Each structure stands twice: as structure tokens, then as C-alpha cells.
From Swiss-Prot:
Subunit structure and binding partners: Component of the SWR1 chromatin remodeling complex, the INO80 chromatin remodeling complex, and of the R2TP complex.
Top enzyme class: hydrolase
Catalytic activity: ATP + H2O = ADP + phosphate + H(+)
Organism: Encephalitozoon cuniculi (strain GB-M1) (Microsporidian parasite)
Gene Ontology biological process terms from the UniProt entry: chromatin organization; DNA repair
Keywords in alphabetical order: Activator, ATP-binding, Chromatin regulator, DNA damage, DNA repair, Helicase, Hydrolase, Nucleotide-binding, Nucleus, Transcription, Transcription regulation
GO cellular component terms listed in the entry, alphabetical order: nucleus
Residues noted as binding ATP in the record, renumbered to the chain: G62, P63, V64, G65, S66, G67, K68, T69
Protein name per UniProt: RuvB-like protein 1
Length: 426
């Protein structure tokens, strides 16, 4: 079965398009045009990587369709998966269930990663024998109940027989662990992880394509250093709501469908726990990036909160985006401000200006979007299509690409004219 996936509007952007010295260069998967803005964004990326940008704010300003979000996506791609990047819109803070500042606080803590280093006792080896003993369930005739489990693990040095708790059967069954698999069992938590198939069974006939791994060396019981990466918000949620499988926990989740609001006291407990790991040298903080699009949708209360956050020592880099000039500040009784932002917050922000794309840049953007979505078009149709981006808008043209794909094959001028007549620009 072929899996289909939606193509995101900025899926063609995979980098900022900078060389090793930070100068803008043309790349087939980079942000198009906007050389000065790309160079400025490269400096932001470098400062985030070296943890010198924490607790600072940047505003990307420019007209509609000029590439503000594309620039933010380029920053995210340059930072990579190791640095958290959270994206939200200014209108997302308004809710009947949760306070505006709570939504912002949650997004901020999603953007801060904690890498915790922990020493764990683990059993690791190849499964030589797996024996499951079941018994009749006294409450019903079906299904049978797991009474006990035994497993023999082998390394290059020794073998060891282990007795496992019946509650671990679900993990074994879910991962389809059988003889010949190399597994990893944590002593304290009871987590079982299948690492792969032993290389000793590479020549066996098997319908499933397994990953083959060497037989572990040394003793079966060993102490390993495990790195775990979680955000502060993940730690908050783990402490805020029960995650057990008992009946009381399930009933609590059914009766509490509302979004859980995390208290300041709980966040303080999480911060103290993380600080303890930091003082012992068992953890490190990785400040990430929070991107807030349409920042002019926030109100005075949100701006005051963000102003305080920027001054705090534990804060990610905040990137705003706005297409407004002088605009009313929400919640201020009609007071005007640049980009709809209060002056106190604006004084602490550095601004990256994005200009309207020239026709040649629009032509290249449309070409890449067509390639990304697999649309073919003859030269006359392409010239006419690019002309629509000038007479109407670039966003309008990009929104027509999925519609033109319904014609199949190579799209002609007549096809473009038909779609343009049916669907109008705002």
C-alpha cells in the first residue's frame, strides 16, 4: 500500500543557503533571494548554536508573501533536530479554558531541551531461550494468565538466566521478541528494547527484514550511560497528570477532558530537579527557538509577559514575524505601535527586514514548488502562470498548483486560464 502525505507549503526550504563563511549563495534547496535577511538569519543560527542568543528576541518584518515564514523554516532546518524549534501563531493564545500567559509559557518550555545523563544497570545479550508459563484465569476461562517468564541471555563471555515479571509480557509480544534477538532490559524500570537480530542468524531464511547486530561483549549485567533528551514541558506534563494504567488513573483522565493547566509550584519543582542534575554535571540545557507568527495578534498582557521572559536567565530565543506597519496594539484602547507591538518590548528586539520578492525570485519559487509537487507545464503556460504572481499574488499562484495537478500530464495555457477563471484571488 502506498502511503500519501500532504506536501507542506515550505517543504522545498531545507536551508538558508549560506557558505562556510556565512555569505549567501544559491542552492537548490535554500531560501530564494533575500540575501541580507539570510545573512542576518545565519548570525542568529550561529548565536543559538553557541548558546549566546538565549533570552533575546528577533522580529522578521515584511509584506505579505515576502518569505518571512520561509526564513524561519530555514533557521529551523539549519539548527537541526538537536535544537528544539517551536512554531505558533499569535492567535493561538486565546482560549476559554487556559490563560493566554499559560499558552505562551507552555510554548516557551517546549523550546528548552534538557539532556540528562544517567547511569543505568541493564541486562544485554542474545535471547537463547524464552519460556513463558501461563495458567488458567480464575475469573474467566479466556484468556489465560501469564504466571511467570524466563529468559536466557548470552554474550560473548557468559550466559545468564533471568526471571521476568508477568507484566513485561506485553513489551515482548509487541516487539515480537524471539530466540536469536538481541535485547536490552533496564533493571530498575523494566523497559525492554529489541536492538535487532543477532549476526549469528544472518543466513537464516526470514520473511521479515531485520536489522542485524553483533552479539554483545562482556558480561550480561553491565552499567551503561544513557542520554535522554526531554523538553521542560515534557517534564511538566509528566508531573502534572497521572500516567498509570490503573483504574483510578483511567477514570481521572475520562472525567477531566479539559486541558491541564500546570501550576507555578509544579514548574518550580521541575526547575529544582533540573538544577540538581545540572549541579551534579548530569545534565545540560539546550535553549532552542520559539517562533511566533502574526505577533500583532497578541495583546498588551502577552507583550508584558514576554518582556519579563526575555529578561529571565532561562529563556529560548524568540523570533517574531509581522506583516504590519503601524497597527493598533490589542488591549490598549486603540493605541498605535510599530508592528502592533508595545514600545517597551520593541526596544529589546532586533529587526530583520524582508523585502518584496522581484519577479525573477517569484519565477524560481514557483518552479521549485512545481517540482516539489510533481507538476509539469509547457513554457507558454509557465510564462502565463508566473505573470499571475505579478498581477495577483505569489500565494495565489502556489495555491493553484494542486488544482492544476488534477488535469494530469503537461498543463497548457488553457488549463491555467480555466482554473484562474474558476478560482479568484482575494
Amino acid at each position: 500500500m502506498v502511503k500519501s502525505s500532504n506536501i507542506a507549503i515550505h517543504s522545498h526550504v531545507r536551508s538558508l543557503g549560506l557558505d562556510d563563511c556565512g555569505n549567501p549563495v544559491e542552492k537548490p534547496d535554500a531560501v530564494i533571494g533575500q540575501e541580507n535577511a539570510r545573512e542576518a538569519a545565519g548570525l542568529i543560527v550561529e548565536m543559538v548554536r553557541t548558546k549566546r542568543m538565549s533570552g533575546r528576541a528577533v522580529l522578521i518584518s515584511g509584506p505579505v508573501g515576502s518569505g518571512k515564514t520561509a526564513l524561519a523554516v530555514g533557521i529551523s532546518e539549519e539548527l537541526g533536530a538537536g535544537t528544539p524549534f517551536t512554531s505558533m501563531s499569535g492567535s493561538e493564545v486565546y482560549s476559554n479554558e487556559v490563560k493566554k500567559t499559560e499558552v505562551l509559557e507552555e510554548a516557551l518550555r517546549r523550546s528548552i531541551l534538557v539532556r540528562m545523563r544517567e547511569l543505568k544497570d541493564v541486562y544485554e545479550g542474545e535471547v537463547v531461550e524464552l519460556r513463558i508459563v501461563d495458567e488458567e484465569n480464575p475469573l474467566s476461562s479466556y484468556p489465560k494468565r501469564i504466571k511467570e517468564m524466563f529468559v536466557i541471555l548470552k554474550t560473548s563471555k557468559e550466559s545468564k538466566k533471568l526471571k521476568l515479571a508477568p507484566s513485561l509480557y506485553e513489551q515482548i509480544d509487541k516487539q515480537r521478541i524471539v530466540n536469536g534477538d538481541v535485547v536490552y532490559i533496564e533493571v530498575n524500570s523494566g523497559v525492554i528494547k529489541k536492538l535487532g537480530r543477532s549476526e549469528a542468524h544472518m543466513n537464516d531464511f526470514d520473511l521479515e527484514a531485520d536489522t542485524y547486530v553483533p552479539i554483545p561483549k562482556g558480561e550480561v549485567l553491565k552499567r551503561k550511560e544513557v542520554m535522554q533528551s526531554v523538553t521542560l514541558h515534557d517534564l511538566d506534563m509528566a508531573n502534572a497528570r497521572p500516567s498509570g494504567q490503573d483504574m483510578l488513573s483511567l477514570v481521572f483522565r475520562i472525567l477531566s477532558p479539559r486541558k491541564t493547566e500546570i501550576t507555578e509550584r509544579l514548574r518550580g519543582d521541575v526547575n529544582r530537579m533540573v538544577n540538581g542534575y545540572l549541579e551534579n554535571g548530569n545534565a545540560e540545557i539546550v535553549p532552542g527557538v520559539l517562533f511566533i507568527d502574526e505577533v500583532h495578534m497578541l495583546d498588551v498582557e502577552c507583550f508584558t509577559f514576554l518582556h519579563k521572559v526575555i529578561e529571565s536567565p532561562l529563556s529560548p530565543t524568540i523570533i517574531f514575524a509581522s506583516n504590519k506597519g503601524m497597527a493598533p496594539i490589542k488591549g490598549s484602547d486603540g493605541l498605535l505601535g510599530p508592528f502592533g507591538i508595545t514600545k517597551d518590548l520593541l526596544d529589546r528586539i532586533v529587526i530583520i527586514s524582508v523585502k518584496r520578492n522581484p519577479d525573477e525570485a517569484n519565477r524560481e519559487i514557483i518552479r521549485r514548488r512545481m517540482k516539489e509537487e510533481g507538476l509539469e507545464m509547457d513554457d507558454d503556460a509557465f510564462g502565463f502562470f508566473v505573470g499571475l504572481s505579478t498581477s495577483r499574488s505569489l500565494r495565489y499562484c502556489i495555491s493553484l498548483i494542486p488544482l492544476l495537478k488534477t488535469y494530469g500530464g503537461c498543463v497548457s495555457v488553457r488549463n491555467v486560464e480555466e482554473v484562474a477563471e474558476l478560482f479568484h484571488d482575494s
